[in-house]
Amino acid sequence: MTTINQLVRKPRVSKKEKSNVPALEGCPQRRGVCTRVYTTTPKKPNSALRKVARVRLTNGAEVTSYIGGEGHNLQEHSVILIRGGRVKDLPGVRYHVVRGSLDTAGVQKRRQGRSKYGAKRPKS
């Protein structure tokens, strides 16, 4: 246990919390340009071809972000918006593409959970 005198001389230092999404720099989303759009395979025990994009952000950071939903229209030089959120079975992927904003189209024929995929309300 420290004495009052010791604390007066040298106060306690609080630990800094490390961010899971450092490239966003505290912002909720960031704009960027796709430098490469490709598919990659997940870790064991899963098996698939996950769609990801390498993105150069406006702050100069280059990150890998996941393209959720069925089908997408992204290609090189597409301007996209990314948000935080990792993909557990893809190492190094800590960001998600925001569907339905900027150059990214929403998911077609999406009926449920539409807001997560930028899909408009269907005509009833």
From Swiss-Prot:
UniProt superkingdom: Bacteria
Residue numbers of 3-methylthioaspartic acid PTMs? D89
- Identify the GO cellular component terms for this protein: small ribosomal subunit
Family annotation (Pfam families): Ribosom_S12_S23
Query: In its UniProt record, which GO terms are filed under biological process?
Result: translation
**Keywords for the protein's UniProt record, in alphabetical order:** Methylation, Ribonucleoprotein, Ribosomal protein, RNA-binding, rRNA-binding, tRNA-binding
Residue ranges of region Disordered? 103-124
Concerning PROSITE patterns, the annotation shows: RIBOSOMAL_S12
Q: Which NCBIfam families match?
A: rpsL_bact (TIGR00981)
Q: What quaternary arrangement does the UniProt entry report? A: Part of the 30S ribosomal subunit. Contacts proteins S8 and S17. May interact with IF1 in the 30S initiation complex.
Stated role:
With S4 and S5 plays an important role in translational accuracy.
The identity of this protein, by name, is Small ribosomal subunit protein uS12
